[in-house]
Amino acid sequence: MAKYLVIVESPAKVKTIKKFLGKNYEVMASNGHVRDLPKSSLGIDVDGDFEPKYITIRGKGEILAKLRKEAKKADKIYLATDPDREGEAISWHLLHALKLEGKAVSRISFNEITKNAVKESLKHPRKIDMDLVDAQQARRVLDRIVGYKISPLLWAKVKRGLSAGRVQSVALRIICDREDEINAFIPEEYWSLDATVDVEGEKKPITAKLYGRGDNKIAISSKEEMDKVLNEIKGKDCKVQNIKKGQRSNKAPLPFTTSTLQQEASKALNFPISKTMRIAQQLYEGVDIKGQGTVGIITYLRTDSVRVSDEAEAMAKDFISKSYGDKYLSTGEGTKKSSKNIQDAHEAIRPTDINRVPSEIKESLSRDQFRLYQLIWKRFTASRMAKSEYETTTVKLSVGDYVFSFATSRLLFDGFELAYTAADDAKKEKQPVLKNPLTEESLLTVEELLPKQHFTQPPAHYTEASLVKTLEELGIGRPSTYSPTISTILARRYITKESKNLYVTEIGEVVNSIMKESFPTIVDEHFTANMESLLDAVAEGKVNWKTVVENFYPDLKDAIDKAENELEKVTIHDEVTDEICPECGRNLVIKYGPHGKFLACPGFPDCRFTMPYLEKIGVNCPKCGKDVVLKKTRKGRKYYGCIDNPECDFMSWGRPVAEKCPRCGGYMIIKGNKIACADEQCGYVTDKKPEREE
């Protein structure tokens, strides 16, 4: 019989941890939270001391019964939930739900699920940290009060199914504000002028950009101005005016935090934030590695720290020295100090063992697991390496009275770039490299002048990655909240996502307008950031959590009372389509159900006709010529089929494109970041970069 009971959150961890501990240990899972506030009522004593009234979550009774049974047999119980505020709160709820007060119960935590980390945690058991628990309770109570009090108001004034939230409403406002900026933007004309210049001894011409006239930088805002410049330049000699040499170095990147991993995975791998977190959770909880068994291969994924343990630091130093040489080791310069937002004593996201090289375990991972692990491994490895060094040359050319310039760079030492290049850096325009050094006597000839008209561009739409970056910079939310916040406003259809960009819907605009008018404090980014700081203060034991809630609630109650009396009802019109109801002839409208969009007759309840909403992708069926539509399997996997199914049985897992294969005449699909023939035996691939759909 097992002497010790270890309780973790997920069954996946059970499998991993069990093999690390002997037969004296029983490892069981709580399957996440076991207690929460009730769904049917507020569950908070707002007229008293704001004490939450927790109940057992439906469906968790059987799990708790099994845990109680094992707990009675055990000499000692270890609560081994995640190493953050949420995990601390789950341990506290387990303590009470299992009635373990007064028994031999300890809290243990580990930042990685490896044999050493788990065994080491058992040597350092501790009590539950009530400051961390209270910080989580404060967040839960504040979020419940905002959601439970404001959401019914939205139901009454707009439509049922809407919700407001302390963080989600701020995120929505940020997206709406950007949309307003874009709509209000007035483009302004400007012109650029490039000169392709032949350099004696070089095979390819270089491109220099117009800088100015004499010592003054100039801006050209019309065709007339550009024509004047061109007339003054034509026929003039091109001479080297000035050559300025220098050196620059690029510092190694910091290892990933939750937000930087989400941003980089979005840019480099095209992963939505939710997918990044799902795959990272798998890598953290444990994957079956050939020859090693089940093991966690990355550290804890919810962190805003860039700290690295001494053990991992030493392991990285040894690996880099052996793999690349001592000159590639970091000198330790530029180490970032902790941000004011950093929680607890977490580490950065890194591989649990740098010697577990991605290519060597590729066969044990799914494609997505491998790509994300490789990204994390490369970033961490690079973060412990030396900076890269470049020799730079900036050249100014005179053509008559006008000055053109270009810059070149030559790699002196690749440093960390040997291991990793960030997605943004990979997209940067490559600078020209000259075989022979330029001198002021070099012979130059202007081959062509290339004027180009431009218009200033509005701010870019937010993407999931850029929204996470903004939320973090503003101090809104924490690592555990970024993904669910974005998922919520997408699920509520306040925003939509098209080719990565986030767009506000009509209903999103209405909800944001109501929140700004009636609850300006809730959607104020500075207020929300300050609230996060107060929650941090609770976690540090500096502020009582109930004081935070007590100071927040009265103003919210007054705002709700005022809105209930003064807000007028808003009507949201359904989007009308060109599809005709076969039963009554009306134009069908788009409705939303638990499984997404569907088409319905606006004549309800007199006419109850409905049909699935089929999203046309703008491509004709290769078999019958009718529209190809996006569909989903019962398990949610996307595929593409003919709108005339079952009469036409065309089906493709890859997204078809309009062009035909020039080699075999078959249809082409998007395959990774290329366009390729759907027939693998043909094997034709183009160099075109497709517009990716999410």
Q: Model regions: which residues?
A:
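C-terminal or mid-to-C-terminal helical accessory/interaction module adjacent to the motor/catalytic core
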Residues: 113-195, 246
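Alpha-helical scaffold elements adjacent to nucleotide-binding pockets in ATP/GTP-utilizing enzyme cores
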Residues: 16-20, 66, 89-97, 117-121, ...
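Conserved short loop/turn motifs at secondary-structure junctions
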Residues: 82-83, 159-163, 245-254, 266-269, ...
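Metal- or metallocofactor-binding catalytic centers and their adjacent structured scaffolds
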Residues: 215-254, 442
